[in-house]
């Protein structure tokens, strides 16, 4: 599906019906990894309209010259929300850099939000300010690695904590294929300059704490964004659950899929209670 905004057409996928959840993917990928991570949760849960968009310069949404920084990316997301679910209360979720944008949505629309999900969240856009553990492989599969070309194996497993065929398929399907179709020139214009990649405002200096049920899930071995920084924002979310999962890095969605699904399901229970609805079957 496409949403025609003033100066850009945003591609998105909408699944299910009911209370809307806006899902924001990570940097240099597209909405497919969010679908892979979260759709299994909704197999036995009705009443939720999941809206997965491709951010500008990612997936099937083009980059535009006028989008030069994170603030303008957020403007597109807010405009998209206003057009697709005008005047409605909603839930927002984001992974990695999408979690940074999701907090931007909270900053501007907290009064309309019934829930917040942050997985492997990017907290600071400045690489030098992140607290990250070194990469480690906890579950090695030497036979699998030997089947791959050395360059491919290095590319696949340089950040993975678990070496398995499931992880290989996940990265190939949800990350490498998305890298190929994204506008890398557009992405680099923002990502390679910290002043462009960061918001111009402190996204975590909320005027008031966000009262909606929140789930923050980080990987204990995440060598991309770490886990320690996410703890620092917890006081913004008095209804927040904070979880750090062992045996998982930035690919937490596949490395600890069952635990993630259980946590998201429990978070949705809390959101439904908070919003005064029940959709469990």
Regions found by a protein language model. Name each.
Residues 8-62:
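Conserved HGGG/HGGXW glycine-rich cap/lid loop of the alpha/beta-hydrolase fold
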Residues 49-93, 262:
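Active-site loop/oxyanion-hole signature of alpha/beta-hydrolase fold enzymes
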Residues 94, 98, 102:
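Gly/Ala-rich beta-loop-alpha elbow adjacent to hydrolase catalytic centers
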Residues 103, 107, 115-147:
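Flexible "cap/lid" loop of the alpha/beta hydrolase fold
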Residues 127-128, 132, 147-208:
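Conserved alpha/beta-hydrolase catalytic His-Asp/Glu region
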Residues 210, 216-218:
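Short beta-strand/loop motif that positions the catalytic acidic residue
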Residues 221-225:
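Acidic catalytic loop of the alpha/beta-hydrolase fold
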Residues 248-261:
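Catalytic histidine-centered segment of alpha/beta-hydrolase-like enzymes
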């Amino acid at each position: 599906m496409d949403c025609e905004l003033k100066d850009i057409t945003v591609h998105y996928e909408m699944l299910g019906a009911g209370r809307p959840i806006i899902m924001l993917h990570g940097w240099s990928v597209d909405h497919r990894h969010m679908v892979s991570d979260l759709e299994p949760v909704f197999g036995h849960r009705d009443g939720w309209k999941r809206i997965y968009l491709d951010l500008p310069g990612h997936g099937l949404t083009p980059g535009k010259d006028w989008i030069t920084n994170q603030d303008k990316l957020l403007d597109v997301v807010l405009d998209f929300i206003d057009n697709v679910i005008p005047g409605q209360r909603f839930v927002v979720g984001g992974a990695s850099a999408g979690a940074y944008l999701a907090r931007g949505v909270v900053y501007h629309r907290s009064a309309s939000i019934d829930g917040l999900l942050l997985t492997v969240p990017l907290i600071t856009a400045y690489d030098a300010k992140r607290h990250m553990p070194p990469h480690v492989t906890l579950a090695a599969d030497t036979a699998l690695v030997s089947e791959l070309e050395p360059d491919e194996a290095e590319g696949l497993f340089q950040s993975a904590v678990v070496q398995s065929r499931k992880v290989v398929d996940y990265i190939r399907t949800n990350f490498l294929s998305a890298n190929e179709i994204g506008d890398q020139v557009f992405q680099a214009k923002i990502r390679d300059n910290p002043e462009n990649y960061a918001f111009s405002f402190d996204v975590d200096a909320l005027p008031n704490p966000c009262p909606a049920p929140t789930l923050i899930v980080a990987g204990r071995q995440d060598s991309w964004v770490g886990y320690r920084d996410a703890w620092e924002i917890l006081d913004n979310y008095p209804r927040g659950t904070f979880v750090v999962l062992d045996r998982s890095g930035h690919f937490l969605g596949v490395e600890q899929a069952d635990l993630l699904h259980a946590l998201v399901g429990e978070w949705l229970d809390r959101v439904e209670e908070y919003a005064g609805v029940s959709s469990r079957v």
